[in-house]
């Protein structure tokens, strides 16, 4: 079935094709009067017809009622329909496909308890998302753990180890990236002969991460009649391609639920120079003007370490998340951040930015699409491609790209819990990336704040040591971001502060930046990678011995100490603080101060006068050793 996108960026049938039935589209209002649509209006999980053990697990997760995507998708999936669900980040898409899969496994085990085979395959774009989805399946199957077995293929282990894991545990559900899944299918470790359910989570990212060949090979190995569920935050050309490969007469859920998430997010922008980014970051975190858990997004790996070393100068602890770190270390960082071990994560978003950079602009320049685009998260995609192409990566950094993990992603899919603030230290290259970044905060009705730094054209390249190429397009990207957020009914406000007060801290910022040299950054990358490789081996052994818990904590926010240390920068003197924030002590708080020296100081003075410390005055006369020498006669 051939399809194309209409002016609303929605898949439609190509004129002239003869098909019995087009895709069934269900928007926020129920479109067709099927039995499933009536069930979709359920106000509780009990109305969805789930197993009591699953309902008990749902209650344990403190889920009060199903979200819009859950109430629409779960009944359709239980009926055996193929589903393509488009809903915003944080709307509960994972539970929307996990619960029907578990229901099908439990139903099959009741009919044939002895049948053990892989019946469900969940494909995700990143290793971090593999771990997250595996844990979600384990949580929802907590009260039926004996009947349901799940395996997540995440660790960078040999094929032989993965084969033994799949054969020994006899899982019902496998979670993996497409490349890892196909490698095991090709080796015979993963059998798809009896597969009944297939899930493509974050489907719009799967192709952009370069899994097209792996997906085609997996599709050729699927048996007939496999039920497929695809979830995505956006509807793009990639989705249309995947739909033609995997789905048969799917139900399209294009859901726009009440914007509770976005309404809780307060967005601010700051116009600043390239070096002023570091100045503002120092003030915000050292003076604790930002409180709570924070994710700081930067453009690349070098910026990660430069900002971390800069923070170290002032005693600000932070940990790093980028594609060069071992997968076990990345998983550990996310897990411990969610358990409140760390408060600040500096995350590089280079994979998503590279994806936008490499994506060709549709319709040439993309102007026509910008005029008729009504999909908020895909707005001006062609212009985003132009902006990203205008800022190519330096050739020196291309060598470093080879070490990066293509299966790394941080701004999409990963469930960071209780994030209070998202700081766009470097503005992304597209409005779509901005939308996904701010989706890390303000989740589940909680309040959140987004603070974005942007460099105007007149300040670009004014401070070479801290300059990056992508900052040249900050104004263009910001204009599209503001336009996109305005369509969503959100406002981006300027972040107001007293610039005179900020300038008084500049000399301290300059001292810290001078210490963070290119050599220090390069040594920090090498040292951090070496340390994390050792930690990763410890974590891998611990995961093998204790798969259900992670009590062995390995700190990831230690100091790298490759930059020259300035201990005096760790303390902020009172005279730099505004009058309202000074620690001025009253006379009552100071206490009694005697006029004369205390007795212990007097004793110390007498001791030095007598020559107890054998200290001589500068320029004074040295004692004659013949006169001062004393010796006692030896007694027999």
Swiss-Prot record:
Residues 1-44, 352-407, 600-636 are annotated as: Disordered. It catalyses: ATP + H2O = ADP + phosphate + H(+). CDD domains: DEADc_DDX56 (cd17961), SF2_C_DEAD (cd18787). Belongs to the DEAD box helicase family. DDX56/DBP9 subfamily. Residues 74-253 form the Helicase ATP-binding domain. The gene is DBP9. Residues 31-44 have a biased composition (Low complexity). GO terms for cellular component: cytosol; nucleolus. Residues 392-401, 603-612 have a biased composition (Basic residues). It comes from Pyricularia oryzae (strain 70-15 / ATCC MYA-4617 / FGSC 8958) (Rice blast fungus). ATP binds at residues 87-94. This is ATP-dependent RNA helicase DBP9. Transmembrane segments: none annotated. It is found in: Nucleus, Nucleolus. The keyword Protein biosynthesis does not apply.
């Amino acid at each position: 079935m051939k399809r194309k996108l209409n002016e609303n960026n929605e898949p439609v049938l190509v004129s002239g094709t003869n098909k019995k039935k087009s895709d069934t589209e269900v928007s926020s209002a129920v479109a067709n009067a099927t039995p499933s649509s009536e069930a979709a209006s359920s106000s509780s999980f009990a109305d969805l017809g789930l197993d009591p053990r699953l309902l008990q697990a749902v209650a344990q997760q403190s889920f009060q009622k199903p979200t819009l995507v859950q109430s629409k998708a779960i009944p359709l999936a239980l009926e055996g329909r193929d589903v393509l669900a488009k809903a915003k980040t944080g709307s509960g898409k994972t539970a929307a496909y996990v619960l029907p899969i578990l229901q099908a496994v439990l139903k099959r085990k009741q009919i044939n308890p002895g049948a053990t085979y892989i019946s469900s395959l969940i494909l995700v774009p990143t290793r971090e998302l593999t771990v997250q989805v595996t844990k979600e399946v384990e949580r929802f199957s907590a009260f039926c753990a004996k009947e349901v077995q799940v395996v997540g293929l995440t660790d960078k282990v040999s094929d032989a180890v993965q084969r033994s894991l799949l054969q020994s545990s006899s899982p019902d559900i496998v979670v993996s990236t497409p490349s890892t899944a196909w490698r095991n299918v090709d080796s015979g470790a993963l059998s798809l002969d009896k597969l009944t359910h297939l899930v493509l989570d974050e489907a719009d990212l799967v192709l952009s991460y370069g899994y097209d060949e792996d997906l085609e090979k997996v599709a050729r190995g699927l048996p007939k009649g496999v039920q497929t569920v695809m979830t995505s935050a956006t509807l793009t050309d990639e989705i249309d391609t995947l739909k033609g490969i995997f789905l048969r007469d799917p139900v399209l859920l294009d859901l726009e639920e009440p914007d509770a998430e976005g309404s809780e997010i307060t967005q601010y922008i700051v116009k600043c120079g390239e070096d002023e980014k570091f100045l503002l970051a120092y003030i915000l975190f050292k003076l604790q003007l930002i409180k709570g858990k924070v994710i700081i997004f930067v453009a690349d790996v070098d910026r990660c370490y430069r900002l971390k070393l800069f923070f170290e100068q002032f005693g600000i602890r932070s940990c790093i998340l980028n594609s060069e770190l071992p997968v076990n270390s990345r998983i550990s960082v996310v897990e411990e951040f969610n358990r409140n071990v760390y408060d600040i994560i500096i995350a590089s978003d280079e994979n998503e930015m590279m994806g936008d950079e490499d994506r060709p602009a549709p319709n040439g320049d993309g102007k026509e699409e910008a005029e008729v685009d009504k999909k908020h998260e895909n707005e001006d995609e062609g212009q985003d491609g132009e902006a990203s192409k205008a800022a190519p990566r330096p050739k020196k950094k291309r060598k470093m790209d080879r070490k990066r993990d293509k299966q790394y992603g941080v701004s999409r899919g990963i469930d960071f819990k209780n994030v209070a603030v998202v700081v766009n230290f470097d503005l992304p290259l597209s409005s779509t990336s901005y939308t996904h970044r701010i989706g890390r905060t303000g989740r589940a009705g909680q309040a959140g704040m987004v603070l974005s730094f942007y460099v105007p054209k007149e300040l670009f390249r004014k401070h070479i040591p801290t300059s990056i190429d992508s900052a040249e397009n900050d104004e263009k990207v910001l204009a599209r971001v503001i336009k996109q957020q305005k369509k969503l009914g959100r406002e981006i406000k300027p972040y107001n502060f007293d610039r005179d007060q900020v300038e008084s801290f500049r000399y301290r910022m300059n001292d810290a930046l001078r210490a963070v040299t290119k050599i220090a950054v390069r040594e920090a990358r090498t040292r951090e990678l070496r340390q994390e490789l050792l930690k990763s081996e410890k974590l891998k052994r611990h995961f093998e011995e204790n798969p259900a818990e992670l009590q062995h904590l390995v700190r990831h926010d230690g100091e790298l100490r490759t930059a020259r240390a300035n201990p005096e920068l760790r303390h902020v003197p009172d005279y730099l603080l505004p009058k309202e924030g000074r620690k001025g002590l009253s006379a009552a708080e100071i206490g009694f101060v005697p006029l004369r020296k205390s007795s212990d100081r007097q004793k110390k003075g007498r001791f030095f006068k007598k020559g107890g410390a054998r200290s001589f005055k500068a320029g004074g006369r040295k004692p004659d050793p013949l006169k001062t020498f004393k010796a006692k006669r030896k007694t027999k």
